[in-house]
Amino acid sequence: MKFSYLYLTLLIIWVEPLKANVDINEIIDNMYYEIVNTKKKYLSIKSNLRSPYINNYSLYTNYLDSLRLLAGNLEIKRQKLFLSIIDIDLSDEDIYFINELNNNSILLFNIINSFGRIYDTYLINMISSEYSLEQYSLDMESLLRLEKKYSLFKL
């Protein structure tokens, strides 16, 4: 009888950490794929916005709204990541991966918002000459440097 209790106790000790690892791995994988999918959607919107075939103002505003939604959804997913790991015992490796995911998520969020701000400013000032082509070029150059500097698009 004592052997059964000992066996049961050991089984619980060994099974619980495995259960936690499966949950944390699933959480990490979900956030990773969320970042990758958001990056793909961002690149798609970016290429469509820069297309010479778009000449309708309403299409531009639709794309800008899509960028806002994309950034908002990414921020919500990032917050859910931290809410979901509150009660999980994390290893050093898990903490490292979560930190990397958090950094990439924040970086992608900032890049999406920067790109949206550039095009929003461009659209608002398209009729007037307050936002020059030179300023637009400088803004886009700094955005591209930000994308390359952090190697975000090697995910």
Predicted region positions:
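Extended non-catalytic scaffold regions that mediate assembly and binding
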Residues: 5-6, 10, 45, 49, ...
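N-terminal, post-signal-peptide region of Sec/Tat-exported proteins
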Residues: 40-79
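Long, amphipathic, charge-rich alpha-helical segments that form helical bundles/coiled-coils
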Residues: 64-130
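Short, charge/polar-rich alpha-helical segments
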Residues: 23-33, 61-68, 98
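Classical Sec-dependent N-terminal signal peptides that target proteins to the secretory pathway
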Residues: 1-22
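C-terminal amphipathic alpha-helix
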Residues: 24-53, 104-155
